[in-house]
């Protein structure tokens, strides 16, 4: 089972504050483990524009119609000082890895330098930090019913309002997340 380019959808029973009601986009999944980004937990008071200012990146050919007041996401508890940019695949950058036909993850500064310009990818999600699972750890969590999985959907990833992503990701596989029982019963 390879969950690259899938969503992990936290079950209602998952009470860890970091992962409660989370949607994690899996960027890589192989025999050594998995890596992903939480895509529905915006950081307080931090926008893409704020990140660009902190890094002293000022686009020279700024397009006024491109909004930079979008939130930066808390991608996970690891390397919270490192940026990860998920974006549409029409262009790649110095440190880009193709996750799917339509989605790329980039960690290099050159993608940030395009933000707010005509060179910017059509869809962009900026996160600080990431999630990782060691070999067989994610599979064990799936066996313990901590997560639902669904194929990733770029509309949910980039366009669905943040507060609705958890519900919409579950709905994409026919599940009403609010109707899932927290305990199994016996007949």
UniProtKB/Swiss-Prot annotation:
GO cellular component, one term: cytosol
Transmembrane segments: none
Family membership: Belongs to the UPF0301 (AlgH) family.
InterPro entries in the record: AlgH-like
Database matches in SUPFAM superfamilies: VC0467-like
Protein's recorded name: UPF0301 protein ETA_28320
The organism of origin for this protein: Erwinia tasmaniensis (strain DSM 17950 / CFBP 7177 / CIP 109463 / NCPPB 4357 / Et1/99)
Xref: Pfam families: DUF179 (PF02622)
